[in-house]
């Protein structure tokens, strides 16, 4: 089984689920025009802070100059990486097998999974067209929060929600839900299917091949 990007059944929403497989792309969506203020809350404010940083980089005319694409990408990856908890996402996506891994295997898996998630990054930057976003509300329960938004593009409205975990000093994203489809759950289903008939080493091999394709010029 080949590892794929996130997907939903409606073809109309395919591109948005592709965005869900690129973390920077997701943030770029939210850097559009906010048509409704977000409900006040720590998690929402954390997302706003990251979104503002992303928007600043995306709109920087100097970084749009030929030859500076790699620099812009690295800056965006840094900003997104500060908000998204790739290790927590990896742990949840892999499920129970995570607890059996060595620290070395965990580190390798996180790095490969992060590359997979950010694989469609460049395309999302180029495709960004200033979609509007409606901020709906924030729901919190102890150390967990969900910031609910809706992307407005033409006549289509697509629910886009961020699930965050309070890490003590900041809120970090551990899942993204596009039109009711959890990114983490989607990958957990794929990984579980692979591991039912193959070894963890086989899964890593597939991730390495996918990563090499993503990094290829």
Task: Kindly give the residue locations of the regions a language model identified.
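Short hydrophobic alpha-helices and adjacent helix-cap/hinge residues
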Residues: 39, 58-62, 195-196, 202-204
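N-terminal secretory signal peptides that target proteins for export/translocation
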Residues: 1-17
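Short beta-strand edge/turn micro-motifs at domain boundaries
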Residues: 157-185
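C-terminal segment of classical bacterial N-terminal signal peptides
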Residues: 28-37
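Sec-dependent N-terminal signal peptides
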Residues: 17-27
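Low-complexity, intrinsically disordered terminal/linker segments enriched in charged
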Residues: 178-217
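Early exported N-terminus immediately downstream of N-terminal targeting peptides
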Residues: 42-117, 121
């Amino acid at each position: 089984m080949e590892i794929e990007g996130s997907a939903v059944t409606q073809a109309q929403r395919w591109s948005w689920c592709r965005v869900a497989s690129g973390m920077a792309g997701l943030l770029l969506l939210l850097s559009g025009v906010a048509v409704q203020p977000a409900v006040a809350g720590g998690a929402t404010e954390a997302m706003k802070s990251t979104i503002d940083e992303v928007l600043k980089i995306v709109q920087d005319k100097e970084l749009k100059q030929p030859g500076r694409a790699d620099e812009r990408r690295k800056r965006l990856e840094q900003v997104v990486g500060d908000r998204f908890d790739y290790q927590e996402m990896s742990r949840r996506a892999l499920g129970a097998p995570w607890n059996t891994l060595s620290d070395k295997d965990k580190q390798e898996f996180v790095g490969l999974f992060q590359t997979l998630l950010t694989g469609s990054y460049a395309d999302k930057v180029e495709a960004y067209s200033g979609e509007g976003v409606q901020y709906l509300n924030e729901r919190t329960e102890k150390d967990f929060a969900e910031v609910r938004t809706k992307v407005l593009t033409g006549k289509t409205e697509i629910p886009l929600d961020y699930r965050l975990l309070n890490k003590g000093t900041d809120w970090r994203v551990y899942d993204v839900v596009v039109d009711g489809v959890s990114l983490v759950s989607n990958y957990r289903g794929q990984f579980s299917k692979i591991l039912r008939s193959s070894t963890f080493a086989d899964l890593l091999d597939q991730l390495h091949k996918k990563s090499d394709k993503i990094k290829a010029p």
